[in-house]
Amino acid sequence: MSKRRVAADLPSGTNSSMPVQRHRVSSLRGTHSPSSLDSPPASRTSAVGSLVRAPGVYVGVAPSGGIGGLGARVTRRALGISSVFLQGLRSSGLANVPAPGPERDHTTVEDLGGCLVEYMTKVHALEQVSQELETQLRAHLESKAKSSGGWDALRASWASSYQQVGEAVLENARLLLQMETIQAGADDFKERYENEQPFRKAAEEEVSSLYKVIDEANLTKTDLEHQIESLKEELGFLSRSYEEDVKVLYKQLAGSELEQADVPMGTGLDDVLETIRVQWERDVEKNRAEAGALLQAKQQTEVVHVSQTQEEKLAAALSVELHDTSRQVQSLQAETESLRALKRGLENSLHDAQHWHDMELQNLGAVVGRLEAELAEIRSETEQQQQERAHLLACKSQLQKDVASYHALLDREENN
């Protein structure tokens, strides 16, 4: 008895020799790639690799020849679906669903929802028809089980191969979606980093301008300190000269009196007259000297008074100037303290900004490094999955050749 295999359309490499297409979708999880289908409820494992069972891939057998000539034509009649409906199924299948991307809009989502609703309706109809066909196929297989003892092992091998192919397709779609998500995250971090660059440059320029202001304030402070030192030296010189002038004036006013010894008087008239004349001349000279001294002292007193008045005026002016200078010094000291406080605040702000920028750069570098490592890992996994997929496709083509040869042998046996 000849047996033919009825399998669902695979996501890639569909063979036209498989007459019946059968899909089963239980749920839609998140975003699917155009070639991915949801897996059935029961979890199944494969003997080859560690892949998950391919969703929507089922293997059945349909008799060819024999009763009613079951085959492609009989299957189509059993399905009760016109060629137009099947063509619509092929044109509106998952292969035509556009691949989602990070920039899909609301219209694309609505179109995808409509396509998925239409597809689900057709899938439910196909499931009902497939259940009827499966019942017929199982009844026919049970009647032919004795003559086809080796068919179970072959069917298990085919199921395993199709399962591995479907699992590889699903894993590839999942990895592609994960790569797109990671790439979108990396682009977002890169955009944030580029947006932060102008703020960082503006902060650096502001800090540079503040450094210039601080340097100018330091220069002004140094100049004012030099001026204060020169004013202090001039004030000390004026104080010393004033003290010296006062001491000289005191020395001039404090004159010393000369002590003169008495001359003994003679006993004669001439001696008496001579003594009187000498005393009179001495008194005259003394009075003249006293008058000259008094006049000179008066003149010196007037000069000293005038000089004292000028010195007092100069001292008052110097005291006023000293008061103004001290007030300027105090204001400059207060301004210097405020500039120092401003400098400390700016230095703290600069330190905080630099620390924050360093932390941001470190975080971004760590994120970029992690994303690059994940991207490299995903690329390696993708390459491995592609290699496994190519290997499975080769196995599939080999199995299809074996199935074709088995079909030929079964046809010859049936004809014989």
UniProtKB/Swiss-Prot annotation:
Name of the protein described by the UniProt record: Phakinin
GO biological process: cell maturation; cytoskeleton organization; intermediate filament cytoskeleton organization; intermediate filament organization; lens fiber cell development; visual perception
Function per UniProt: Required for the correct formation of lens intermediate filaments as part of a complex composed of BFSP1, BFSP2 and CRYAA. Plays a role in maintenance of retinal lens optical clarity.
Spans annotated as Disordered: 1-48
Residue numbers spanned by region Tail: 397-416
Keyword Repeat: yes
InterPro entries: IF_rod_dom, Keratin_I
A Gene Ontology term for the protein's cellular component: intermediate filament
Family: Belongs to the intermediate filament family.
